[in-house]
Amino acid sequence: MGQKVNPCIFRTGPNLPRNWESVLYANKNNYSDFLLKILKIRKIINTEYSFAQITKILIEWPSSKNIVVNIYAKKIGVIIGKSGGDIEKLKQNIAKITSADVSINICEVKKPELEEAFIAQTIAQQLERRQSFKKVMKKAIHASMKQGAKGIKIICSGRLGGVEIARSESYKEGRVPLQTIRADIRYAFAEAITTYGVIGVKVWVYRCDVNQSRINEVK
C-alpha cells in the first residue's frame, strides 16, 4: 500500500527547498511549552486577521526574552490598522502568551497567485458565497499558471453544489512531481463552511526545481 506524506514536511530541512517556519531554542523539558505557545500565536493571528489573506507566518524565538514574528499577507492594511493600532494590540496579546519583547514585521506578498495558502483560502471563500466550484477551481489554476507556476493541482471534497452524496473533484495543469525532493512544491489546506456542510480544499503548487547551488537561498 502506498503511504502519503505532507509535501511540505517532506521537503523541509537544511539542504532541502524549504526551511522551518518556526525557529526556537529549547530543551526536552520546556519544548512542549514553547510549541504550545507558538500554536496559540498562530491561531490568534489566523483568527483575528482571516480577511488579510495571510500566506505565511514565520516565528523566530532566539531566547526567552525576545521573539520575532514575520507575517506575509496580501492585504497588509488589515493587519496594521489605523495608525498601527492593530499591530500594538497584537504585540500585547503575544506578549501575554510569551512574556517576551515582541517584534512584528509585516511583508506584502507580490504574487499571491503563486501562494498555496492564498489560493486555498480564496477558493474556500468563494465556495462559501455559493459560487460554482468548477469555475472557481479553473480560474485559480489559470491565474497561477499565468504568474509562472510550472504546475498546480486542486482537490475539493464534500457536498459540492449541495448534492446529497459527497464526492471529490480535482483539476490539474502542468506537472506536480511529488516524488522529486528537489521540486519546490507548496501545499495548503482550507475549509469552506457552507450551509450544506464543510468542503475541504487542497492545493499543490509546483514552482520550480531547486538546484544544489541555490537550495539554501529558497525559503
Curated annotation (Swiss-Prot):
It holds the Pfam family Ribosomal_S3_C. Belongs to the universal ribosomal protein uS3 family. GO terms for molecular function: mRNA binding; rRNA binding; structural constituent of ribosome. One of its GO terms (cellular component) is cytosolic small ribosomal subunit. Part of the 30S ribosomal subunit. Forms a tight complex with proteins S10 and S14. Coiled coil: none annotated. This is Small ribosomal subunit protein uS3. GO terms for biological process: translation. Keywords: Ribonucleoprotein, Ribosomal protein, RNA-binding, rRNA-binding. InterPro entries: KH_dom-like_a/b, KH_dom_type_2, KH_sf_prok-type, Ribosomal_S3_C_sf, Ribosomal_uS3_bac-typ, Ribosomal_uS3_C. Binds the lower part of the 30S subunit head. Binds mRNA in the 70S ribosome, positioning it for translation. Residues 41-110 form the KH type-2 domain.
